């Protein structure tokens, strides 16, 4: 019989799940959430939107196709921890360079396996997301990694989870945004679009480039004047982690540029547009995370299966003067999934049309963005209005 090093997951509500260590040996704390995707664990781990969170994968067996550098969504994992019913110690994939555990050890991802993930997910769906701690016995008791944690030790970790800072009200983007602007290399000249990086995924940049956009990625704190000085044809507000409410600098930028540039927002970018227009956001009970969320397009009547990762949503009824109208809704719970400005070429979706991982039903939105840019430029004769430059002091 193979002996396994012990580990626990301690939640702030006092629940303790006992399992086995996997990945980097240590301790970690974060907000515990779950993702229903069957594949794509590497993309999930390296998505900056998961910064500050411990992710539970509902699919029971994870890791059997290893890790391929081409599937990274950023330059490193951003998850605080990873949870699965069972991780695979072996892998089979001609594209892979290493096993999932070797990848976790390389980047310091603390994980746990062997717990009842179905029970954990039911707990999160019923009671909402909670803070939690993963602790490895080998980290605290290297002399006896196979022993059990005592009840007193478990309560220490429960208290540590309770004491951990909430994601609510905390600006998580400053930990993931690019420190300096950069241009994404493309094979052809296209429409110059400024991408505000709140935690952008590589695949989003690639999809924009594929439809004829020259992406210029800028830090989250970039001012409207700095953006307009780049003479862009459009503006893109990216995905990112955490609560959108504290990002007042981003709300201000989005508000000042609204109507001056065709604008497309995804995920956190969608929420920022809602707040910029005077609306409100709210934290969801357990959010939407997975590659199988049904969304209805209210403009066409079509249903799209979408990839999602968000714990906050926009209350469109709170946006004054009907500035935005709903374009997409979630068929599971009726929450807003997309909106468009009633007067300006500004639109956004709460989900991820680039997928990675997930279905490709909504990739048409990138083409729509180019169409909005072309129409705006044709109507105004220039990608940058003289009036806008004067308004911003450029």
UniProtKB/Swiss-Prot annotation:
HAMAP family: CPSase_S_chain. Its EC number is 6.3.5.5. Belongs to the CarA family. Small subunit of the glutamine-dependent carbamoyl phosphate synthetase (CPSase). CPSase catalyzes the formation of carbamoyl phosphate from the ammonia moiety of glutamine, carbonate, and phosphate donated by ATP, constituting the first step of 2 biosynthetic pathways, one leading to arginine and/or urea and the other to pyrimidine nucleotides. The small subunit (glutamine amidotransferase) binds and cleaves glutamine to supply the large subunit with the substrate ammonia. Composed of two chains; the small (or glutamine) chain promotes the hydrolysis of glutamine to ammonia, which is used by the large (or ammonia) chain to synthesize carbamoyl phosphate. Tetramer of heterodimers (alpha,beta)4. It catalyses: hydrogencarbonate + L-glutamine + 2 ATP + H2O = carbamoyl phosphate + L-glutamate + 2 ADP + phosphate + 2 H(+). SMART domains: CPSase_sm_chain. This is Carbamoyl phosphate synthase small chain. It is an enzyme of class 6 (ligase). It comes from Deinococcus geothermalis (strain DSM 11300 / CIP 105573 / AG-3a).
């Amino acid at each position: 019989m193979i002996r396994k090093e012990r580990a626990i997951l301690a939640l702030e509500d006092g629940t303790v799940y006992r399992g086995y260590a996997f990945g980097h040996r240590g301790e970690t704390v974060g907000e515990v959430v779950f993702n229903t995707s069957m594949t794509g664990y590497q993309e999930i781990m390296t998505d900056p939107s998961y910064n500050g969170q411990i992710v539970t994968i509902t699919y029971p067996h994870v890791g059997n196709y290893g890790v391929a550098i081409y599937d990274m969504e950023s330059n490193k994992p951003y998850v605080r921890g990873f949870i699965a019913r069972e991780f695979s110690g072996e892998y089979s994939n001609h594209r892979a360079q290493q096993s999932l555990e070797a990848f976790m050890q390389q980047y310091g991802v603390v994980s746990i396996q062997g717990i009842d993930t179905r029970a954990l997910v039911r707990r999160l769906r019923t009671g909402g997301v909670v803070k939690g701690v993963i602790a490895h016995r080998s980290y605290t008791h290297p002399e006896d990694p196979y022993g059990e944690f005592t009840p007193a030790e478990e309560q220490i970790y429960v208290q540590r989870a309770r004491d951990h800072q909430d994601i609510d009200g905390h600006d998580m983007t400053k930990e993931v945004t690019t420190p300096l602007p950069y241009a994404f290399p493309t094979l052809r000249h296209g429409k110059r679009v400024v991408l505000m990086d709140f935690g952008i995924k590589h695949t989003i940049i690639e999809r924009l480039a594929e439809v004829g956009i020259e992406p210029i990625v800028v830090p989250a704190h970039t001012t409207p004047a700095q953006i307009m000085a780049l003479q862009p044809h459009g503006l893109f507000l990216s995905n990112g982690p955490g609560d959108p409410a504290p990002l007042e600098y981003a709300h201000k930028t989005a508000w000042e540029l609204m109507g001056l540039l065709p604008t497309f927002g995804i995920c956190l970018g969608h929420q920022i547009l809602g707040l910029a227009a005077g609306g409100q956001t709210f934290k969801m009970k357990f959010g939407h995370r997975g590659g199988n969320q049904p969304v209805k397009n209210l403009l066409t009547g079509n249903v799209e299966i979408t990839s999602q990762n968000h714990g906050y949503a926009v209350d469109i009824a709170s946006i004054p003067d009907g500035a935005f109208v709903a374009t997409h809704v979630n068929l599971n719970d009726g929450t807003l999934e997309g909106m468009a400005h009633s007067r300006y070429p500004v639109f956004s979706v709460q989900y991820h049309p680039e997928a990675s991982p997930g279905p490709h039903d909504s990739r048409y939105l990138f083409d729509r963005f180019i169409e909005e840019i072309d129409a705006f430029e044709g109507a105004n004769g220039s990608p940058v209005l003289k009036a806008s430059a004067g308004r911003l002091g450029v």
